[in-house]
Swiss-Prot record:
Coiled coil: none annotated. It comes from Nitrosococcus oceani (strain ATCC 19707 / BCRC 17464 / JCM 30415 / NCIMB 11848 / C-107). Residues 98-164 form the S4 RNA-binding domain. InterPro entries: Ribosomal_uS4, Ribosomal_uS4_bac-type, Ribosomal_uS4_CS, Ribosomal_uS4_N, S4_RNA-bd, S4_RNA-bd_sf. PANTHER family: 30S 40S RIBOSOMAL PROTEIN (PTHR11831), SMALL RIBOSOMAL SUBUNIT PROTEIN US4M (PTHR11831:SF4). Belongs to the universal ribosomal protein uS4 family. CDD domains: S4. One of its GO terms (molecular function) is rRNA binding. Part of the 30S ribosomal subunit. Contacts protein S5. The interaction surface between S4 and S5 is involved in control of translational fidelity. This is Small ribosomal subunit protein uS4. It holds the Pfam family Ribosomal_S4.
Amino acid sequence: MAKYTGPKLKQARREGTDLFLKSGVRPIDSKCKIEQVPGQHGAGARRARMSDYALQLREKQKLRRMYGVLERQFRRYYKEAARRKGSTGENLLKLLESRLDNVVYRMGFGSTRAEARQLINHKGVLVNGQGINIPSYQVRAEDVVAVREKAKRQDRIKFALELAQARAEAEWIEINAGKLEGVFKRVPERSELAPDIQENLVVELYSK
């Protein structure tokens, strides 16, 4: 599946919820009618009652788009989650949360996950002192993630940190804003993640 390059708000409208694809400077409902489906007839169209399969597919698409993962990679995450002990759905969320681009976003070094990916791709991030330019890199407990010295002067990072202060602090991450570095203390528990994600629907979809 090709990378989506169209309007990000259109994706949010398709899923009917904020996917955190924009910086959050303004509330998403001030930018678009989130409850209105995209398309020519969106203004008067109602969201049709969906079949079980359609609900499962929509939830998978929502989760995949939220974390910025392509279909093939998302399926690999699911297979890895299924191999691990415990709940497959929770394992899937933990794998996604442990991605380096997500951790950089959670630490406030990128205003969106896409911006965090760009910072990583441009070799602006260190993990335990080593340069890592792979957004999907799996961060482990006690790993130290830092912005490379030459990237610290970027205004967008300062802006992202200001935005991050308005978000709920992630208890599993310790941040030193002055040094632009943080510690991934542990993998988050399911109760600490977004309650509106129905990962069980994703498991049902892939279990068929």
